[in-house]
Amino acid sequence: MFSFWIRKRIFSLITFLLKPIIKFEIEFEDGVSDELIKEAETVYAVPTNSVTDLVALQLLTESLNIFRPLSKISNSNLNRFTCLKAPVFSQKHQKIMRQASYNLESIIELDDSHVSIIPTSFYWGKHPDKQKSLFKILFSQSWSATSPIKKLFKIIFHGRSLVIQFHKPLAIDELKDKGKNTKDNANLISRYLRALFRRSKQAKLGPDISHRRTLVLSLSQNTEVKKEIKRLSQGNAKIKKRLKKKALKYANEICSDLNYPIVRLLIRSFTWFWNKRYDGIHLKNLEEIKKISSENSIVYVPCHRSHIDYCALSYILYENGLMVPQIPAGNNLNLPIMGKILRGGGAIFMRRSFNNSLYSTIFFQHIRNLISRGSSIEFFPEGGRSRSGLSLPSKPGLISMIIRSFASLESVNVKIVPIYIGYEKILEGQSYLSELSGKSKKGESLLDPLRVLKDFNNYLGNAYINFGSPIDLADFLREEVKKLDLKENELNEKPEWLRKATTSLGESIIQGINSSVAVTTTSLFSISLLTDSTQSLNEDKLKQRINLYLNLIKNSKTYDHVWLTNTDASEIINKTVGLKLIKSQLVGNSKIFKPTDDETSILSFYKNNISHIFILYSTVCESLRYVNEISYDEVVRLVRLVFPFLKRDYNLLETDSELDELIKSALKTLIKSGLIEETETGNLIKPNSNTTKYEDFIALSNICEPSIKRFFIVLNTLWEHPSIQREELKKLCTKIAKKLETIEGWPYPEFSDKNKFDQFIDKLLLDKLVKEDEDLNLQAARITKRVKKDYLNFFNQQFINHINEMN
């Protein structure tokens, strides 16, 4: 009795001393509230035997006027809390053993079947935006063990930024196994609580990688790695020993060393950057990701436009209490000092080539381990940055690894989250200029981030992150390959279905990114100005064009979830001018916008960010452009002819099964907007050539015209050369396209991009419209010549003459 009195008085004294220091916020999981706690027969479960956590809980319950943890359960002498205890080394058994959770066995033995356990988590220092002190950052929450001194500093520095989270109640009667005794049931419930607290902490902080040395060692000694070493050594002991050393070296090179003090220091610098150089980062649809984060391993797959994409997503996830992802990065960044900082921020360094089978096995096993532990991963599916502003085709490497890892694991939930990251002005604008002007692309360089420093002091406007609809990997594979079992001994093999599934998932990811695009002020300005045939508009006409494109977006059946960040035409123009992307000219009393060559090149980047939204509208208009009158059925037929290639070119969402309905909807919108007119007989015609509507009609047609012309260049070259090597075909097509750029004045360098020709040739081969013989020569199938006449509907005679002259 005296001992109990002493403990109670000590607890009261500690509570009195800590009360002025501790300030908390409360988080309730869905379905939990203070009213529910009041009404139920409640017992709190806390994750550690911590007096400070218990004091904080006592203060919180007093403020909410609900059951206190030290109050008694009805009709008993038991406190309303249980806590898990850290394992200890047993001298008797000579091993580390779990300790019984405080009070739990006694609670289980109660006759009251209505007692519920409410797991309660504590997060000290979860507001990095409010942390100005280096000490606050160093003593904030992490997975590493906490000494009494560090715990004291944690309370001093983070007592006023504590988050207490109440999880869903657990009915003891439902958790108990009636066939087991009290002790076994206590162990069972303790295991369940440990797993719950671990998942919750992992969702906030990321996986526990506080023992990196152990992780590196276990990765290098993984079963599959051992098998690969055995295969490569072929029984030679010396080779086997050398390969083991290499495996350890590779594992050490690959593994991140996620360090939360480093993360918080980086976050602090990012906060300054986003608030000083940009007007902050604006978010959409993050709540959906929060809901699924605790029960799923999340793979974030954002588009890649800028070097700062890396810090943008990690910053936002951390700021919103989500796990910091592990990010595969090129090992060219693994330099002294910088490499350690990046590794501490979650970087997984990887080589550009996976030709080394031992290295490939180790890297794959690491990705598999991350997924099995519920880690978040972030990578850019396009590979490198898009200098044109268009979405690039996905690279198969990491996507394939994610699929193989998931297929070989049981009871793991994986969600792939496409993300659009957009900027009103990218930091690399000037450094991209040469490539946007049509010069060949330079490779990635370590100095690239330093080259953008000259733009660092400029005002950069707003940044946007829009989270797309998550792709459930189990559902995707079930639909795609109809089977999910991949045996352990086949992990290093690639099943027949993998390539198709990888391609399909890659396409779904890029389409998911495109469907989540943030339509920025600069993108709307750029597409409105650059699609005009003269590329010169006065302010009033430019406003009218912007409003037209806004209306088309709002009426789109496919892209109805894109983010319109600004819908005021005047503000859109003023913002673009304010960002110094273009200067206006005063001609008489009119303000004219006519970009210079450099301005056109930069603006084309922003135009390309949203071009895909208008492709269906544009193709419908293009089918009418060079004919006097056309039937509805003929429009559908012509659009269907070219749309499969446009779909691949722009990573479009429209499916073949819904295309007819979407064309009908697009026609309805275009007719309502006055860009297409109906005759008395029900046929379709373009507007009168002397009207503003005709200018808008032509501007909209201009969006898809370069792509259709590029398709025709390839087909016509194949018709002129019955058997030709792929590289020679690309060379001839690029040469023709460059000449046409000069003749027709195309300002878009992607018109003659070799990669675009590559994509079209791939699609022709896939659809068996082009055949490849034993000597790798390409030959056009006969069916392609039948569509030649149809393709001519999309061009004027002048273009056809130019093509004939060049072949």
Residue ranges of model-derived segments:
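Membrane-interfacial terminal anchoring regions of lipid-handling membrane enzymes
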Residues: 1-807
